[in-house]
Every structure is written in structure tokens, then in C-alpha cells.
């Protein structure tokens, strides 16, 4: 356990945790994970009681208490099969639209999760329109064609309606997962020019309103490094602020601090972290500090949700279309049925268990955290901190120390200085009631 005790004043040499005087304007709306086709496939193979126990651990209040889920519109790279909801060439009237293939195991598993967590926030992302709406005619790679924008908006509205008929409410939709990459045609993907995305968002917003759907649109859904693209879209198409006013980001390139530039110019836009998960062959079970740092940075820079990647995969990171080597939040061994857990799972044990939906985030920093140049080139990584005030008035500090030595910290709270020692390679939770 970490050491924490009150002290009469500041302690020389201990780093100071600084939290802002005021919380961020928008309250935090929850942590989650992607419920991909592959995850549903794996869930469906589990014995009923094992699955119930696992899902209760992930979504129950005594477990991770996740409250957000990302769904896929048709196939993603983490699906057991490749399909859209209308693979009939040039079916612009969408007469052959059908979600039947989701009914085998995708919808049943999602409904099981919704039954366990009735208030879960579900948003959805398409990896590709039907191939016939794109250059090249394939779901794997290619560009979205402008002439199909209106038809594709109808396609998405149909998807939302079909899911809602079955008791699955889609709170938000992203136009396209990662619109700036085609992944060399290895997986369902589609490149969208920013002009095309902006025009499509306007059309989709119109059709959602006409259909009396309150589903929100979260733009972009790609890397932090693309923040300038989002800024350009809002400047070039001011109507997007009313039609959307939300942007979603992944962590594969860039850093969360880039989002400050968006907030400076458009303080009323909402931000979400929508994808980031463990790698199967890279410290899979022990990378909790990586995720403690990432979650802290995302929350400190205004992300209102934080959603990981696959909920559950097998020991080979499958099934998937690729191949790719992501790990699931948990791993189900296909031979033994044994469950093992990622470092990200253990980090959620801190963040999502203790930071409640509706919490107010106080951006945090740690003063004097830089290493001495005497240590060059073996510098430590900075200790990170996140602070949240929950709806029940409890105040939570999440401290991540990724280094091989303990971190000596101090924090002023409730008219009292507190001395804190964060253990090496640790994520720690401190609660002030």
C-alpha cells in the first residue's frame, strides 16, 4: 500500500500536486470499452454462468463499473466476418438493407449487456459504407463518394432505428472510424476528405431530425494529431457547431494536450476519447501505468468519456480481419476457457470504479516533476495525476507513477497538507470524503 499522512506544512523535495481552482465546464460521462463483433463472438462461446460473472465484473458497481460501450456498424477489423447491411450493388433505395447477420451473436450479447447495465451509453462507429458507395467497390480501402452521401445517411438512420426497435438505444454515431487511413486495404476502412465529412454530417443531422431521433454526431473519430482537421472543418463549415459540435479522438498519433487548441477557439465543443487498447505482445498484463497516464491526460484535457478497444478476445487477439495483434480488455483462452486480464483492466479498476458518471474534473499537474539532467539519457517518465469530484461529493485523486522508484508527493486539501508516497510502477487511488 502507498503511504499517506497529514503533515504540518510543505515538505522540501516532495513534488506538489496542483489542481485547478475550478472544474472543467462539462461533467465526465463515463468509462467504457468497445463491444466489437469479435468480442461478441467470444462472449457467445462462454458458458452462460461464466459469461454472467464476467459481465458483472466489467459492468457491475462492485467491479469496473463501466458505463459506456462502442458498437460497430457492420464489420470492423475486429469482426469474425466481413459484411455491410446492404451488399447489393447500387441498391440506392436500400430495399435489401438488413441487420440479420448481427442477430446471430452480436445483438444477443449487446442485449445481455444492456440488461445488466440499463443506463449504459452506447455509441456506434462504421468502419466502411457498403463497397458500392466507394471508389474501388470494396469495403476494404477506397474513398467515400460524394454522390452517395444522402443514401448513406439513410443507411445509418435505418441502422439506428433497427437497433432501437430491439431495445438498443444509440446515443451517438461517428461518421467514420479513422477517416484518414485505408490500412492498405487489409480491413474495412474508408478515407473521407474533410469536405465530404462536413457535408455528410450536415445531411445526417438533417435526416436524424426528420426521423425524430436524438442521436448525436461525434465527428472525426481518429488521432489526436488530426485536431487541425477538426478545427478546419468547424471554421470552414460553421453550421457544424450546431449540427454536431462534438469531436472524438484516438491515441495512436499525437497527444491529448493538442485538444487544448480546439477548446481555446471553440470552448463549447465536446470531446471524447473513443479508442485505445492493449497490445497482445507488448506488456499485455502489466501496462497499467501506460493507461493511468493516458486516462489522466484525456480527462485533464477535456474528454468527457474514455472508451477502450475490444472487450474480449482470444489468446491470439482474434478473431479479426487483418491480421492484427491487439489484445482484449480480457483474454479468453480458446483451449482452456481461462480468463486473463490486461493492464488496462487493472487501471479501470481504479479510474472507472472510483470516478463516477457526472464527476467534475479538476485539471491537475505535478510541479517540479522533471528529472535532473544528471540522469540523462535515462530520464524518468513524469508522474501523472487526475482529480475528480463525484456527485456524492467524494474527491478522488488518481496518481500514476511509471518509474522504478517511489514518488514523493504532497497535496493541499481540506485545509491540510498531505504527504503521499506512490509506489514504483503503480496506479493509486486516494479518496477524500
Residue ranges and their predicted role:
Residues 1-18, 122-124, 154-162, 166-171, ...:
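Substrate-binding and catalytic surfaces of secreted/luminal carbohydrate-active proteins
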